[in-house]
Amino acid sequence: MILSIGEILADMIGEKIDGVTTFKAFCGGAPFNLAVNAKQSGAKVGFVGRVGNDVIGRFVTAEAQKANLDYLDIQTDDERNTTI
């Protein structure tokens, strides 16, 4: 099993339409991206990371669960915000 440990964050991609900028959030972070790509290549993969107790943290945790990794441990930190 490949175990990737590190950051999981939200990548915010902006788009300007009719003078209004909107943003879409995507789950990212190099260690998490590595885990997802390895899983898609057929490897058995786990990921361990930490997010803040905030809306972005809940978003990336929900997105990470959709990746169907073999092991997932995302801890919540009440004292820090999730990185964007």
What are the language-model segments listed below?
Residues 11, 29, 83:
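Glycine-rich phosphate/pyrophosphate-binding beta-alpha loops
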Residues 18-28:
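Short pre-catalytic strand/loop immediately N-terminal to key active-site residues, enriched for Gly-Thr
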Residues 8-12, 33-41:
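Beta-barrel outer-membrane channel/assembly domains of diderm bacteria
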Residues 1-18:
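Positively charged, low-complexity intrinsically disordered leader regions
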Residues 17-20, 61-63:
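Short, glycine/charged-enriched secondary-structure capping and boundary segments
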Residues 1, 24, 36:
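N-terminal glycine-/serine-/threonine-rich phosphate-binding loop
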Residues 44-84:
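Conserved N-terminal subdomain of the carbohydrate kinase-like
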Residues 27-31, 56:
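Conserved donor sugar-nucleotide recognition element shared by glycan-biosynthetic enzymes
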